[in-house]
């Protein structure tokens, strides 16, 4: 750590959207954002779970627009930066400009781990706006560390000043994380930061985040009570407690985080965010974590096991954006019974 302060990036109000089918009320957003700001996290990501303009038939319709959520958070935040997520092909540079005008000052431009080349326009435009611009390589387990580093180098070349290893499937272990950060550090400029976005499907969200920091990672994503897709993200309050015991500087109020996780966020979960049969299958099969609730819906509709659908999706190497294939897979499984 060398005494540096970790950058704590909360994702409760973006990845956490998946856990409640994108149904946060504006009052939920204000309460959670204020609690995060009071506890002094560095950034608070706000958007539909699938990023700007993710509200759709394919991904699920949100209770509010991205701009309404961003404005609600920006109204109550005094210390943290408001962040948002943009997936090229879903969100556009026009959506990014609107998010900036609503109060977002950080953007994470997210692509599949082998498709960084589609992010050039969005990263360049974010830099023109003056935003803190992050490259976000989703499903990082699906390519080699060396290939991931090449993709990271592309994003850096477009203008991203921080590149994330993103374990969207919660499928990696500590060795996987170390290998990827070493590969990134070997090719990126010394001034380019790195970040870690973990999912907890194998119960390794905190351990993987710690491994990332030990390899020089600058920014850590986490969420209250792990609120996020699948078994959730690295639980913010747990990671901070572990970081504190390691003597790492994080600048946040652990007890305030613990209180907000249990008092504000956990009561909102209509399906517990935890490692269970279905979420473990996500991590074991290496499936995009936000497929969980779509798979459970399809399983109920077609009289199937959600685990069977998830495992088959893993075999077919489906990635984020292919939610429409969940029903196809379910129908194939039903017909092959």
Curated annotation (Swiss-Prot):
Residues the entry annotates as binding substrate: 14-15, 168, 197, 288
EC number in record: 4.1.3.39
SUPFAM superfamilies to which the protein is assigned, alphabetical: Aldolase (SSF51569), post-HMGL domain-like (SSF89000)
Pathways per UniProt: Aromatic compound metabolism; 3-phenylpropanoate degradation
Manganese keyword on record: yes
Entry keyword set: Aromatic hydrocarbons catabolism, Lyase, Manganese, Metal-binding
Catalytic reactions on record: (S)-4-hydroxy-2-oxopentanoate = acetaldehyde + pyruvate
Residues of the Pyruvate carboxyltransferase domain: 6-258
Enzyme class: lyase
Cross-referenced PROSITE patterns: PYR_CT
Residues of the active site: 18 (proton acceptor)
Residues the entry annotates as binding Mn(2+): 15, 197, 199
Superkingdom, taxonomy of origin: Bacteria
One of the GO BP terms on file: 3-phenylpropionate catabolic process
Residue(s) at site: Transition state stabilizer: 14
An annotated Gene Ontology molecular function: 2-isopropylmalate synthase activity
UniProt key word Metal-binding: yes
SUBUNIT field: Interacts with MhpF.
NCBIfam families: 4OH_2_O_val_ald, PRK08195.1
Xref: HAMAP family: HOA (MF_01656)
The family this protein is said to belong to: Belongs to the 4-hydroxy-2-oxovalerate aldolase family.
UniProt function note: Catalyzes the retro-aldol cleavage of 4-hydroxy-2-oxopentanoate to pyruvate and acetaldehyde. Is involved in the meta-cleavage pathway for the degradation of aromatic compounds.
Protein name, entry field: 4-hydroxy-2-oxovalerate aldolase
Species for this entry: Shigella sonnei (strain Ss046)
Lineage, top ranks: Bacteria, Pseudomonadati, Pseudomonadota, Gammaproteobacteria, Enterobacterales
Gene name linked to the record: mhpE
